Amino acid sequence: MRVRNRKGATELLEANPQYVVLNFLEAKAKWRDLFGNDNPIHVEVGSGKGAFVSGMAKQNPDINYIGIDIQKSVLSYALDKVLEAGVSNIKLLWVDGSDLTDYFEDGEIDRLYLNFSDPWPKKRHEKRRLTYKTFLDTFKRILPENGEIHFKTDNRGLFEYSLVSFSQYGMKLNGVWLDLHASDFEGNVMTEYEQKFSNKGQVIYRVEAEF
């Protein structure tokens, strides 16, 4: 989702170093120091305007959250939500999330969220899908043994592809939801996309996969 450039976005991000980590390369292997505790660290790749990551941080104060997005203006809106939520257990990264080993040491994070990632439906773009095996290689490195990926999408094709990709990689599927909002799953925090699609009656798919 491309968002129109927001005037003052850079200044807003720079004015809130308690939430926005600008020296991200120096943060590698030091995230627990930045949070000031040893609580688990959960990362959302492609956090958009921040509804999910800020909502999760508010819902789970004993877990540290990191939201990543490549778009500066989008991340500034995520910062708005973080400030509104009044939470301290969250950091935001304005970076390209294609290689998370640039920002995280091996085993440094405890869970990864992939929400409504670009489906890249054309076969020639398969390697760009975040559930493609080369991305799974990267995710496995930064997660601990038995680390989990929690994945949500409205795109059935991407969901089916991801189930196969996880399984072929040798991952264990701990939970599969073919219609999340019609299930008894508790504690779901919606993204902006999820709210939009749900309002249109679209089915939301979810899976928890463990390395």
Curated annotation (Swiss-Prot):
The active site is at D118. Signal peptide: none annotated. It holds the Pfam family Methyltransf_4. GO terms for molecular function: tRNA (guanine(46)-N7)-methyltransferase activity. Its EC number is 2.1.1.33. It catalyses: guanosine(46) in tRNA + S-adenosyl-L-methionine = N(7)-methylguanosine(46) in tRNA + S-adenosyl-L-homocysteine. Residues 124-129 are annotated as: Interaction with RNA. InterPro entries: SAM-dependent_MTases_sf, tRNA_(Gua-N-7)_MeTrfase_Trmb, tRNA_methyltr_TrmB_bact. PANTHER family: 3-DEOXY-D-MANNO-OCTULOSONIC-ACID TRANSFERASE/TRNA GUANINE-N 7 - -METHYLTRANSFERASE (PTHR23417), PENTACOTRIPEPTIDE-REPEAT REGION OF PRORP DOMAIN-CONTAINING PROTEIN (PTHR23417:SF14). This is tRNA (guanine-N(7)-)-methyltransferase. It comes from Streptococcus pneumoniae (strain CGSP14). The gene is trmB.
